[in-house]
């Protein structure tokens, strides 16, 4: 078929997207990302290659994916609406008592309480109150920390202020360090403080070794070492912390009861949402309409959405995001693991035109694209009464940008081309899908106005840095599988080619860059001026990638996150 050239037409050559090269990714802070790395339109003048030829079909990059977690255990669970309503009334009664505590405490006590509210997953009930208190308290933070020698207290203060975008310097920990930068040896037995310091900063753990005499503290430490608070999903951390807090000797019974009731309230909402998504998936009936080349990830995609926003008021938003992720996974697998190059070109062309029949392609691909188009129409129905149709149009534009990038990767894989690392990253930061995920996360949020979507489209450094970190995580986690299905244009391979290093050296460098970009994400978190709630959504999308890819490809090999998913859906918290 014709290829993409400077004026937007198609040819058999590779797609050229954005600037020809990026500056070196060392250091990453010097990187300047293109705001428009892909041509806005792809235009086909005529098709010259049959997309159904036997030769092409014989060269499909077939790959057998592991099954979904969605089995009878998940399909059999249900939520009683009367129980949800009863829990809601209990929450309102307890919320008033907790709110009184916030008002009556002195500054340090209040910050410790805010830390508990965040850790227990109930801070969202008091967001406005908390933000107002911290705005005033931060003006006196130096006096608050003066003479404070309790490392646990300093760690709590540090975490709370930074979480609410008050940039408290990590220099507050210098008082606990030797001249060489190590923590004082006398602190090494204070496991709780060191755990909190590690969790709040997300730094490499160099100081704590050995076990704990307190079993529940030992379990908490293991959780933090597996995924720090900067990396883990809030909903998972809340579930873990409630269990930890219950075993603390001096826990507050009112807070504990409030947290348990609130979490079960959320869990029952998640169960209802899963039922909605499963019903939609069954009615879609893609399993009988398209070849079985793809991952079915309904419950896993809802878990992703829960990690982006866990609050009950975002139930519709989670359903919108989950459905989008389910279809994206299937289309991503179409490009990566099934379609031929002419088919990939045809699908992308039809996607650009937002039609199923503009360019000839197999019926199963028409069904898939029609499913996506219909889903976007459903979303328009959800936001029409709010006057936010523009939000879905922004989302559609992000789909097109994403699939143009996927086409480029497909071309590289099908032609055996290995670009240099800089060329690869221009495309790779798009195929990571952070931008499209943030866009669809915003669609269901009434508070996300046109300015929020303009912010995404401006390609702010905050999101671009999350893009980069996510791309690096994904490249490390998926390298072996991508090689197995013939995708030789991987980040690792491209880095080895450009810098003439071994595979082992490339992996070490990728891990170093992941650590470095994590610091950059934190820096940009404080520089970004859009509303805090929206910034946190983007930040949480990055956390989703950490949670699912730090220890392997959790979307493909769902056992990696199976324990977390089970704890949220199947293990309902006891009150």
From Swiss-Prot:
Top-level taxon of the source organism: Eukaryota
UniProt source species: Arabidopsis thaliana
GO CC terms of this entry: chloroplast
Coiled-coil positions: none
GO BP: diterpenoid biosynthetic process; sesquiterpene biosynthetic process
Residues that hold Mg(2+) 2 according to the record: 332, 336
Positions of Mg(2+) 1 binding: 332, 336
PANTHER family according to UniProt: OS04G0344100 PROTEIN-RELATED (PTHR31225), TERPENOID SYNTHASE 9 (PTHR31225:SF242)
Compartments where found: Plastid, Chloroplast
Lineage: Eukaryota, Viridiplantae, Streptophyta, Embryophyta, Tracheophyta
Name of the featured protein: Inactive terpenoid synthase 20, chloroplastic
